[in-house]
Amino acid sequence: MAHKKGASSSRNGRDSAAQRLGVKRFGGQIVKAGEIIVRQRGTKFHPGTGVGRGGDDTLFAKQAGAVEFGIKRGRKTVNIVAAGQAAD
């Protein structure tokens, strides 16, 4: 077997950069409209009230308020509780 492969071949690719996925704002944190809450592949978390979903499944705040994680019908959901209701 040859140790040298030829003029134009490469010696394996290199490691790719991480995608920086995950939860960016945790439960109880205050967010403004447009802030990213979760970066994900697929819908590990589903959008609830006050939360939108981008084309790459990123969840973002549609309104200002406190982030709230919960479970609805067996799915993990993310909601935004308006600032006035957060004290309840």
UniProtKB/Swiss-Prot annotation:
GO CC annotations on file: cytosolic large ribosomal subunit
Similarity comment text for this entry: Belongs to the bacterial ribosomal protein bL27 family.
GO MF entry, a single one: structural constituent of ribosome
Keyword Cytoplasm set for record: no
Pfam families: Ribosomal_L27
Disordered: region residues: 1-21
Protein name, entry field: Large ribosomal subunit protein bL27
GO biological process: translation
Sorted UniProt keywords: Ribonucleoprotein, Ribosomal protein
Keyword Glycosyltransferase: no
HAMAP family (alphabetical): Ribosomal_bL27 (MF_00539)
SS bonds (residue pairs): none
Superkingdom of the organism of origin: Bacteria
